[in-house]
Amino acid sequence: MRKNQTASYQGNTIPWIEKLLETPIDDHRKNAVNLILAPYLINVRKVSYDAALNIINGWLSKCGELRQLDQDFNYMVRYALKYCAKNGNRPLKLETLKTKNLILYDLLKS
């Protein structure tokens, strides 16, 4: 990995994404699942589909305690996991998140 890249890998983990998995959020959950968590779990940590589904559903359950989920995320989570497995998508880098979704970035930095 080049020095100028912002993703900091420790084995098969990225610390800021691990922090996200431990941090329930009340908004931007769909973006977090599609652009960060599904690609991270499938293509970086390389957990199984079922394990990734359980991890994300557990995280969403904690998020739902802050603010009820607006919709049934089950289909969206399953689609995101299958899409990432098929296409090899990588999670957004933290710096890319800063430009694409500043609100989510700020939630993670606080």
Regions found by a protein language model. Name each.
Residues M1-N34, Y40-S110:
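Basic, alpha-helical nucleic-acid-binding regions used in initiation and control of genome expression
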